């Protein structure tokens, strides 16, 4: 099967005439890797099929939400029942309360929660809430971490710690990003210096505990510990963006793993998405009662949404969370994910190709490097041309990974040992050609 497959190409041409770049989210366009994107017609379990009918083992999982795989029976039943009752009411429902209870039961740092429709909306709202609760304007984020496409977060680093960021997108005024300071991930000294210079003005620090848009880079325990200490010391809020990691790497999210290493650790605000919607447009942000009660209608921080708490989306999310809360779920998922990375590493080593990887729960990443990077500049050392060859070799062999060098991958409960073995077999052949 060639890169420009018969039926995907004309679909892409039709799409490009009507939709900018032919896609509704840029990474789907294959611009980073070249070739024609696959237009998916259906999915089931661990598999997707494109317009040509080619089957792929799916390691994107809709960029993370499909932790149970596609078309899980319990989720389908819940969604079908909810759809028959009504698509949207613009009024409260019991299921919103049930979903909030389920999330809070597993993520105790979230004493209260607000449901929204996307990770971008949740991150944007969390920043507004942090600013409103602290009566401060400045925020600290980290190079390589992605928190959605809200204006104040589309920022790259300035020339130094005394210089705030520059917009990474046209259409974002400098006046919007002038309060955002961008630091290097896992750099404790830089974070300390930033608070020395700007501490009284910092509303929050926002970070991914595992940076999935750097492929897979963990926040070190000392870095996370110091971020918590500095926020507490200076009266800033620590915002943990678990849109990708929440319920994906552990039932309590990545923050539950850090709490095992850092006694008493908890963020002030948590941002969730992806898995909590089970594939439907649903996200959330939450935190302590004192902070969350700053939101309208109780407090002065405004936030609203026509489709927030959508009854079909909440049904999908609730059914998903109830399935993944069953005993042994994460042990099995984590073992399968580890087997994938170990298999890929072994296949690469046999071919003399440098590859290192990491996993947590159902999330993984690998780099064509001899050792794991700790920040964005180190991630950039990956061989992009070699990755593109690997990507297309896997795709032609029926294995669908992210069409971008810096994106994490995902294993679902539907992936079998045979799926992992088949993936490694395809990769073994491709590595021999790199």
From Swiss-Prot:
Superkingdom of origin organism: Bacteria
Keyword set, alphabetical order: Cytoplasm, Isomerase, Porphyrin biosynthesis, Pyridoxal phosphate
Gene3D superfamilies associated with the record: Aspartate Aminotransferase, domain 1 (3.90.1150.10), Type I PLP-dependent aspartate aminotransferase-like (Major domain) (3.40.640.10)
Subcellular location as annotated: Cytoplasm
Co-factor(s): pyridoxal 5'-phosphate
CDD domains (UniProt xref): OAT_like
GO function term, MF aspect, one: transaminase activity
Gene: hemL
Keyword Cytoplasm annotated: yes
Pfam families referenced in this protein's UniProt entry, alphabetically: Aminotran_3 (PF00202)
One annotated GO biological process: protoporphyrinogen IX biosynthetic process
Protein name (database record): Glutamate-1-semialdehyde 2,1-aminomutase
Primary location group: cytoplasm
């Amino acid at each position: 099967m060639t890169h420009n497959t018969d039926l995907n190409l004309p679909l892409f041409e039709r799409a490009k005439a009507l939709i900018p770049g032919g896609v509704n989210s840029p990474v789907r366009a294959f611009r980073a890797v070249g070739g024609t994107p696959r237009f998916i017609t259906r999915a089931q379990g661990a598999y997707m099929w494109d317009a040509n009918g080619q089957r792929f083992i799916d390691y994107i999982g809709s960029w993370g939400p499909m932790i149970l795989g596609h078309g899980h029976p319990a989720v389908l039943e819940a969604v079908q029942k909810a759809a028959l009752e009504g698509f949207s009411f613009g009024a409260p429902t019991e299921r919103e309360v049930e979903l909030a209870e389920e999330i809070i039961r597993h993520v105790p740092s979230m004493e209260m929660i607000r449901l929204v429709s996307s990770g971008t909306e949740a991150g944007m709202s969390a920043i507004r809430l942090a600013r409103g609760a602290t009566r401060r304007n400045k925020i600290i984020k980290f190079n390589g971490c992605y928190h959605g496409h809200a204006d104040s977060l589309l920022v790259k680093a300035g020339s130094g710690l005394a210089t705030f960021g520059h917009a990474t997108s046209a259409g974002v005024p400098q006046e919007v990003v002038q309060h955002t300071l961008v630091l290097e991930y896992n750099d404790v000294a830089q974070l300390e210096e930033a608070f020395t210079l700007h501490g009284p003005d910092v509303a929050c620090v926002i970070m991914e505990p595992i940076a999935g848009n750097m492929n897979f880079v963990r926040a070190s325990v000392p870095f996370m510990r110091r971020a918590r200490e500095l926020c507490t010391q200076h009266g800033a809020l620590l915002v943990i963006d678990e849109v990708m990691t929440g319920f994906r790497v552990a039932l309590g999210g990545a923050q539950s793993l850090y709490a095992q290493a850092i006694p008493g650790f908890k963020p002030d605000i948590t941002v969730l998405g992806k898995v909590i919607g089970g594939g439907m447009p649903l996200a959330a942000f939450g935190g302590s009662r004192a902070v969350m009660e700053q939101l309208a209608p109780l407090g002065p921080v405004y936030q609203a949404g026509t489709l927030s708490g959508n009854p079909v989306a909440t049904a999908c999310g609730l059914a998903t969370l109830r399935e993944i809360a069953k005993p042994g779920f994460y042990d099995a998922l984590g073992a399968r994910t580890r087997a994938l990375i170990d298999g890929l590493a072994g296949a690469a080593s046999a071919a003399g190709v440098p590859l290192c990887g990491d996993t947590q729960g159902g999330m993984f990443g690998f780099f064509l490097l001899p050792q794991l990077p700790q920040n964005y500049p180190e991630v950039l050392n990956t061989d992009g041309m070699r990755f593109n060859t690997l990507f297309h070799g896997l795709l032609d062999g029926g294995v669908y990974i992210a069409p971008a060098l810096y994106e994490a991958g995902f294993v679902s409960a539907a992936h079998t040992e045979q799926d992992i073995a088949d993936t490694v077999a395809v990769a073994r052949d491709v590595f021999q050609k790199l």
